[in-house]
């Protein structure tokens, strides 16, 4: 993957657009009719999007308007995918994130330890948790897990949509589960304090990964199959097992929250959040938008490029059903998406303590249990 591909990839880290066309930033739009009590709660809360991209272009220095939008979003930290199918590309992506933080020390920090999340909130910076979704470069040499842990990558996904040496992804019809290499990788990640992410894994791989891990695991960005049956969504038995083992489930802001041709809305997303709370309990659910902080806007040229990328992904066998739909939830598309969700949770009768947990406290808790709280 070249530098252009990385910039395209970070624009929309969703399954629908891992290499999507360039998106445009727009000014922050305030949530409509956010009650003052919710606005105050949000301002004081630890807010973590468990899969999100910070900027539209890692090679172009962010403008003052872009940095203002990031700050005004109120988001404390994000889990940010930096992996590439190749070893060299992944190292280059890590260097790009390091450069972004070095060049904008007042706006960003890399979360290398659990206490850095609170530090990001205290210093009004966006904390970036570098993570992997691809595993090909690890398959060549699983010992690289430790090397990348030393580079600050402390969240790693075992599979993408297809099969890896570690297990089957969600699009594999055989649903073969974890391999011996996958079991060994989980043990190594547990020993190193690296979070295991099973978002794109098949049902059996996910279930076995939860059971094999000595520490809680993440499903950082997914949906509830009981609400809408889709390969990227997880059934209730997996959600229950995840919670029983102390894990975390992040609901994404993707079209896979509802059947086509219905346009997804915040109501559909909240249906998934509430269902997950009912199954998992209030201590295990959050938001992993699978989007970006900045507002996504596609012009005609970008839509054409998006279509080409969908065709490419389908040809490679990694495209999920329904990827050709709008790759975001229109009324949760922007820097304010987490605050809007907070207001929607309040409308559904959730108390302040639960809203704070969903906004970020649950993710913060599980990262502390996996990494240690130093």
Predicted regions and their residues:
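N-terminal hydrophobic targeting/anchoring segments and the immediately downstream early-domain regions
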Residues: 2-173, 229-239, 243-245, 250-374
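Active-site core of metal-dependent hydrolases
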Residues: 167-261
